[in-house]
């Protein structure tokens, strides 16, 4: 860890790239975790498509509401808090996430780039206007239920979850900003991500190509292929606070 501590202590332009492993440590089921009740009959990937929403909006909206309320029932973990603290230590820090929850924001991170959208930012399926009315915060039954989506105040269209579905492109502006940050950083921390979901998986490679060091933090070893690539094995909630403490003592 010593080499990584020195890299972090000397970093001037930091990118932190997070994936599902960070949220899983707060108790959020990953996308393909086994589901019970109503959802046991469906492949999650089959619910996460524009066609599924067009065919049965109440089913898809109900599933995403179940997921959103699951998120509201958990708290940011030490990894989220350490990531937020790093932005206070390194002024030029950019946080890019593949996660659709709001745990980074609740931990204190600002201006988070959500490459796959957010459960907490629904929009109209017709006119794309942001839906700003309050969503319910009551607990959904564990077995799930169908819920009719609200209507857009602007055009009357159905409101859809604000996530990126299979077959949809990632938000162009967010992806462009993430790629630019990776090309300009001197250190990139890749935390809790499998590194296989394209095009976001290009981000660590772009950082390496442009001269940065890359550190993978993951419970399982990550094969490194470059002298400037490092791997710290362990839960992010343990590794990141220790890394923060050692790089910025006091």
Curated annotation (Swiss-Prot):
Task: Supply the alphabetized keyword list.
Answer: Cytoplasm, Metal-binding, NAD, Transferase, Zinc
Q: Which reaction(s) are listed as its catalytic activity?
A: N(6)-acetyl-L-lysyl-[protein] + NAD(+) + H2O = 2''-O-acetyl-ADP-D-ribose + nicotinamide + L-lysyl-[protein]; N(6)-succinyl-L-lysyl-[protein] + NAD(+) + H2O = 2''-O-succinyl-ADP-D-ribose + nicotinamide + L-lysyl-[protein]
Q: Which GO terms describe its cellular component?
A: cytoplasm
Per UniProt, where does NAD(+) bind? 19-39, 98-101, 192-194, 218-220, 236
Q: What is its main location?
A: cytoplasm
Residues the entry annotates as binding substrate: 64, 67
Q: What is known of its domains?
A: 2 residues (Tyr-64 and Arg-67) present in a large hydrophobic pocket are probably involved in substrate specificity. They are important for desuccinylation activity, but dispensable for deacetylation activity.
The free-text function statement in the UniProt record for this protein reads: NAD-dependent lysine deacetylase and desuccinylase that specifically removes acetyl and succinyl groups on target proteins. Modulates the activities of several proteins which are inactive in their acylated form.
Which named protein is this?
NAD-dependent protein deacylase 1
Query: In the UniProt record, what gene is named as encoding this protein?
Result: cobB1
